[in-house]
Amino acid sequence: MGTIAMASINTTSTSGGSAAPIQMSGKANAATPKLNSEVEMGSLPGDAQTQEDDIMQVARVGDVPAMEKLFESGEYDATYHDDEGITPLHWAAINNQYAMCKFLIEHGAEINRKGGESIATPLQWAAQRCHYYTVNLLLQHGADPLVTDAQGYNTLHISTFNGNVLLLVLLLHQGIPVDVIDTFGHTALMWAAYKGFPQCVDLFLRWGASVHATDEQGFTALHWALVKGSPGCILKLIEYGADRFAKTQTGKTPSVTAKELNTEVAWHRALTECGFDEDGHPAVPPWPGASYFLKDKRSFVTRFLFFWPFVLVWAMLVAMSSAPVYIGVPLGIAAVYAIQWVAQQVLEYAPSDMRHFHKTPWLTGIFAATLFWTGVNWLTTVLFATTLGAPEGKGHGILNFLFALFFGFTVYFYIASMRYDPGFVPKMNGIAEQKAVIDELLAQWKYDETNFCVTCMIQTPLRSKHCRRCQRCVAKHDHHCPWVYNCVGINNHRHFFFYLISLTMGIVSYDFLLYYYFDTVSKNASETCNVLSPTLCKYINADSYTSILAIWITMQLLWVTMLLFTQFIQVARAMTTYENMFGIRDGTNITALTSTGAPLDPNHPSLSATGPAAAHSHKHKGGMLKSLSRTLGVDPFIETITGRGAVSGKNKRKKKNPYSKGCITNCKDFWCDPAPIFGQRENGSAVLGGERVDYSAMYESPSLMTITGRRDRGGYEAVGTEDVV
């Protein structure tokens, strides 16, 4: 299947399997600047010609005064070009010399002049190196992004070769047709799929790119994705309805293509995750009524995996309490395994983004089930035994009242944390508004992955973060909690905190109730059993079901208290969990820019990365224990108590928390916020340093606002009841 490679289609232009575009010229091959001070090193002037006399070299280094002198001498002007048609604007563009480009344009440079071996424009030279600030400058002054080079590639195609999503977003907002083709009928989507850039594929598909478009040989984007074998690209194309049986002009389907190119593993995996068998046909569950239940897969799987744990928890408790310990424990484990196996079978037919338990409401259902069966046990067993059924003078009405109160609070705040909008940052109303935001960020030199979300197409406020589970940016994002199946953000953070407090107090009060309950019911119980001490034997023999339930709910106290402790410390420090783990973003680290405009910060990788994690600044590594540690909140707890957090220890001296106003003020801001406790707050509203702020529209840190004295859209302000931040 060697002919499948895109290089073979364009044999006159490319060689091998890279299918990379021809470089702008032999000189351009050496242009790999990382900073503005690095210049194109090809064909430097010889001894007979000084740097000041070589207009091309002056353009490379961006020496505007020297260029002015050359123009004043009358030897050159901005329209000068060499024998290959290359102009000073070409060299300034490929080396990201923004000031030089602006100077040349203002002095009459031909902005769409073609030159070099590939006969390309300055815009294409700049796009080849992902210099999107220079690209934007050229576009503002009339550069045509649809002009093609010698190979038939326009600026969108050339930009796709490098996979820089920010540059592609900029170009798409210029009105370039997303399905524009090159000489051989390849769309940008095909190139992104072939190069293995899942983020670019996702961007083009969300922009409306056709998954059914074919090139001259009948290849679709899905065929090209199978050449590279990128699972992310293949999966995304199938999700958007790519034809799994489309044939090329030679009759080859994607399945045949995958087999001949040894990418069957990625192909079959993508098919499975999208609900198809290995032949590409819809997978049909063997259980009765499956076609009815799976009409709406997402709704059915979500509801099933929330309520099925109710059966799991009940079966575990009954199994373990119905037999001696050496039989009950294995029986309980077997029951849990069997019930989870059923859930796993349902999960096989879930949408592709719900194929793992931690991406579903499974853990939420386990907690809800524990809460439900605890309430049932209290109402049917413990309540009467510790009030009306207790010996005279040994009733515990007050303790029962306290438990009922904490139980009710836990239920309410649990539901509030789960159902309330966590603080999703509002999206733009259309492409025009998105373009206005992009233009504003470019004007402020803030167009980068730190300040712009390519998924939501919005300017990201400070302290916000894009949640890959919720697929939205969340204002003052704390963390995504699998136990409430929701993000914890500015809108529901306090509800989540009250949920933890109520849960902790509820478990403690119930344990006290159970102590008095067993003291009453176990007086005549046998002390004989296996393994356990006589006291525990009496409790289990008196009421084994309640005993197992007590052990189960008390175990929850471990992770709850760790999480509660961490949250108390973070509130006192005016930090979120994300900031505690990965550092504080205050909007001041984006002044130093690389040639692409990305921040000079190792914690913020370029969006040209090909992996799914390219848009966020850290990688999640580790096996099952690490995953369990994150799920139970152990990681932030350890980071907090050991002082190894991102804003503690060695990093403490590097950056002060601009959001902290002192422990007392921080706590007052959080706890005395006028937003309703029993109800939903206005989206993004909060208190910071005693002033009302809107975290869904905060773009500069308070410390920077204090220095500059600005109180506009780029920061925060105290507002009245009719004012909007």
Swiss-Prot record:
Residues 1-303, 348-364, 419-495, 569-725 are cytoplasmic. Residues 325-326, 386-397, 517-547 are lumenal. InterPro entries: Ankyrin_rpt (IPR002110), Ankyrin_rpt-contain_sf (IPR036770), Palmitoyltrfase_DHHC (IPR001594). It is found in: Early endosome membrane; Golgi apparatus membrane. The chain crosses the membrane at residues 304-324, 327-347, 365-385, 398-418, 496-516, 548-568. ANK repeats lie at residues 84-113, 118-147, 151-180, 184-213, 217-246. It is a multi-pass membrane protein. Residues 451-501 form the DHHC domain. SMART domains: ANK. Its EC number is 2.3.1.225. Keywords: Acyltransferase, ANK repeat, Endosome, Golgi apparatus, Lipoprotein, Membrane, Palmitate, Repeat, Transferase, Transmembrane, Transmembrane helix. It comes from the Eukaryota. Its main location: membrane. The keyword tRNA processing does not apply. The active site is at C481. It catalyses: L-cysteinyl-[protein] + hexadecanoyl-CoA = S-hexadecanoyl-L-cysteinyl-[protein] + CoA. One of its GO terms (cellular component) is early endosome membrane. GO terms for molecular function: protein-cysteine S-palmitoyltransferase activity. Gene3D superfamilies: Ankyrin repeat-containing domain. Belongs to the DHHC palmitoyltransferase family. AKR/ZDHHC17 subfamily. PANTHER family: ANK_REP_REGION DOMAIN-CONTAINING PROTEIN-RELATED, PALMITOYLTRANSFERASE HIP14. The DHHC domain is required for palmitoyltransferase activity. Palmitoyltransferase specific for casein kinase 1. This is Palmitoyltransferase AKR1. It comes from Gibberella zeae (strain ATCC MYA-4620 / CBS 123657 / FGSC 9075 / NRRL 31084 / PH-1).
